[in-house]
Design a protein with these regions (language model features):
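Mature extracellular/passenger domains of Gram-negative fimbrial/pilin and adhesin proteins
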Residues: 4-162
Length: 162
């Protein structure tokens, strides 16, 4: 008797499982930690007429909040600040004369690298709403020197529980 056996091929892979064990009252919903806010096409004349665009919402969602020990969350935003418009984000790209601002749901300015906005924690899940907008400085508007092109900015946020 003759037995023929074909060779067996196998592929190996690796899986990394990771996380953080923390002493915080809430966890951050997956997807909240890395977001892209798409602003689309902004018409330059909108900035000359109104100095800024409409608000574009984005959300930070907290999950499974346990308020038995801590009752507030503080949110701060950090990034490269615009030179002409302090408190707003500087942009990268070919567009010039603009900066990106952030506002709270209540309409208060969340200044980059300084403002800490406080929220009362609710038990369970809670969504914090913020808005991004494009702004042009008074000098750029007066000189009609906005340059069209692509733009982007990177901002990080920090949650702390006092």
């Amino acid at each position: 008797m003759f037995w023929y056996s074909s060779p067996v091929f196998s592929l190996n892979g690796n899986i990394i499982i990771q996380g953080d064990l923390v002493d915080e009252p809430c966890s951050l919903q997956i997807g909240s930690e890395l977001q892209t806010v798409k602003l689309g096409n902004i018409i330059k004349n909108t900035l000359y007429l109104h100095k800024r665009t409409v608000n574009y919402p984005f959300y930070i969602t907290l999950e499974t909040c346990d308020i038995s020990d801590k009752h507030q969350v503080e949110v701060s935003f950090n990034g490269e600040e615009d030179i002409l418009q302090p408190g707003l984000l500087a942009t990268a790209g070919t567009a010039k004369g603009i900066a990106i601002g952030i506002k709270t749901e209540e309409g208060n300015k969340a200044e980059i690298n300084r403002t800490i906005t406080k929220y009362e924690l609710e038990g369970g899940n809670q969504t914090l709403t913020f808005y991004a907008y494009i702004s042009a400085s008074d000098a750029v508007i007066e000189q009609k020197s906005i340059t069209e092109g692509d733009f982007s900015a990177y901002v990080s946020f920090m949650l702390s529980y006092p």
